[in-house]
Amino acid sequence: VHRRGVGLVFQDNALFPHRDVEDNVAFGLRVAGVPVESRMRQVAEMLRLVGLDGFAARSVDTLSGGEAQRVALARALAPGPRLLLLDEPFGSLDRVLRDRLVGEVGGLLRALGQTALHVTHDRDEAFAIADRIAVLGKGRIQRIGTPAEVWAEPGTVYVARCLGHENLIELDSGGRCPLGRLAKGAGTVLVHGDRVVIGPSGDNSSPVGTVVESVFRGETTLVRIRVGDLVIGVPSTARVGVGSEVAVILEPGAVVPLD
């Protein structure tokens, strides 16, 4: 792999347990025949970039999970690879540490101008670190684009489900469902919950539904509303009690057709 100019970072970091931090980071440089003096300068710079100044002589057995992944990243970056492949690198870390490292690693890779391919099953992780996302399914790329593009227009039911969209609605031959006429004919559409407004039930121009669930999620509350035989989820900053009747108002761009 190193002969092809590819650096690798794995979920379990795969550090050499019999080597200290400095020797781990220097491994690729040593294989490439980089002279000792230059090698040590590059190792020191890599450790500085990943926030591990002063860790050179540390045994890898004494490192935390986050520190070990930083060492693995420094080792992969040290030889200056054409491509960096990260295979679920944060999967074994707790959520708080994972979120912090995702931001730091993404910023570092951009600062270095490093081309990277990051493999993950975590949607939020992909959105946070990627400039472009490819959603794979059945051995093929199902959708590719920026995080914003892929989220707004998944293209297919498969991709929408992979991304965690829950408002996937089947329309009849007239393009109708309990929310009204959403298309010209039969098919499946995505209704973006963040483009749905919950209003007073007295608004006769909009369908009226009943709140069947209200799930607190910190900054927002996920409100699930039953309209006829359909239930949709809407994030809301307002507290709406279960059993309340509300109008469901679709803003422009709320409805996206899917294949």
Where are these regions (language model features)?
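Conserved ABC ATPase signature
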Residues: S59-L63, E67
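ABC ATPase NBD coupling module
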Residues: V1-G7, V31, V36-R41, V150, ...
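Catalytic Walker B motif of ABC-type/P-loop ATPase nucleotide-binding domains
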Residues: L84-E88
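Conserved ABC ATPase "signature" region
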Residues: E37-F55, G106-G107
